[in-house]
Amino acid sequence: MNPQDLKTIVSSGLLSFPVTDFDEQGDFRPKTYIERLEWLAPYGATALFAAGGTGEFFSLTGDEYPLIIKTAVNTCAGKVPIIAGVGGPTRFAIACAQEAERLGAHGILLLPHYLMEAGQEGLIAHVEAVCKSVKFGVIVYNRNVCKLTPESLAILADRCPNLIGFKDGVGNIETMSSIFMKMGDRFSYLGGLPTAEVYAAAYKALGTPVYSSAVFNFIPKTAMDFYHAVASDDLATQHRLLRDFFMPYLALRNKNPGYAVSIVKAGATIVGHDAGPVRPPLTDLKPAEMEELAVLIKSLGPQ
C-alpha cells in the first residue's frame, strides 16, 4: 500500500489492536486468533494493529512474529487493513518491518526501542533507519523511552517521506499541541494512551479525533458507540459510558502494573472469545477481579 493511502485510512475512524492468542503453555494459537479477527472485522474499525502493544509484541519471538502477521493479513484480506507492530532494537525492528512488508501488511506502527533512554539525535537515527528500510507507511509511537520533540519530528518528516503518522502515548497536551501546530497535515495523528476513550474528547478538541481502542477487543459495539458519540459531540452518551463503564474499568485496570493488557484479555475471555493467558512478566487478573469485570461488561448489554 502506498504510504499516502495508509495516511488517508488512519486519518478517520476508530482503530484497534487485537490481542494475540496463546494456549495454556503460552504458545501462539492461530485457530482462535483467526476466529477473533473474523469476529472483530465486521464491526467497522478503520484498521487493526497486529502484534501491537496490546498484542504483546514485546513478548514475541522473532520466529513467532511472521506467523502472527501472516495470519492477520490473510484473515483480514479485503476486509480491514492490517498495520503490523514493530519495535525493540533498531536491527530487530528493521527485520520485523521488512518481514511485515513482505507478508503484505499495509504499514507498520513503530513501538519504542528497548530499555535505554536516548537523546533526540539517537531517536531520530533509530526512526530514520526503520523508515528507510521499507517502502510502505510508518506510524511512530511516542511513548516511554521514545519521546520525539516537534523539532525532531520535523527533521524526520523531511528525511522520511513514508513516515505518515504520529501516535501519542504520553498525554502531554502542551507537547501534542506543539507537534500538531508545527506539523499540521504532514502527519495523521492517533490517540494512543491506554483506554484512549477517556481522553478522546480532549484530543478531538485539539484537532486529532482518531484513536485506537483496546476495549474494542471485547465490547466492539460499545467501542463504536463511544467513538460515534465523540465524533458527533454527543456528550450525554460519552458521559454515561465514562461514568458507568470506563471509570470503574480504569479503577480495576490500575490495580496492577501491566493490567492495561491483561484486562483486555480477561474481557475477551468473559465474552466467549478466550485469548489465553498473558505472557510473563505480565500477570492475569485474579478471579475476584474477573468477576468485577464481568459485571461491568454485562451492564452494557449485548454486543
Swiss-Prot record:
The catalytic activity of this protein is classed by the Enzyme Commission as: 4.2.1.41
For this chain, the annotated S-S bridges are none
Q: Which residues form the signal peptide?
A: none
- Domain of life, per UniProt, equals Bacteria
Q: What SUPFAM superfamilies would the database entry show? A: Aldolase
Annotated pathway: Carbohydrate acid metabolism; D-glucarate degradation; 2,5-dioxopentanoate from D-glucarate: step 2/2
Q: Which Pfam families match?
A: DHDPS (PF00701)
Q: Which reaction does it catalyse?
A: 5-dehydro-4-deoxy-D-glucarate + H(+) = 2,5-dioxopentanoate + CO2 + H2O
GO biological process: one example: D-glucarate catabolic process
GO MF annotation terms: 4-hydroxy-tetrahydrodipicolinate synthase activity; 5-dehydro-4-deoxyglucarate dehydratase activity
What keywords are assigned to this protein?
Lyase
Kind of enzyme, top EC level?
lyase
Against SMART domains, the record matches this protein to: DHDPS
**What NCBIfam families does the record point to?**
KdgD, PRK03620.1
Q: Which family does it belong to?
A: Belongs to the DapA family.
| Protein name, as recorded | Probable 5-dehydro-4-deoxyglucarate dehydratase
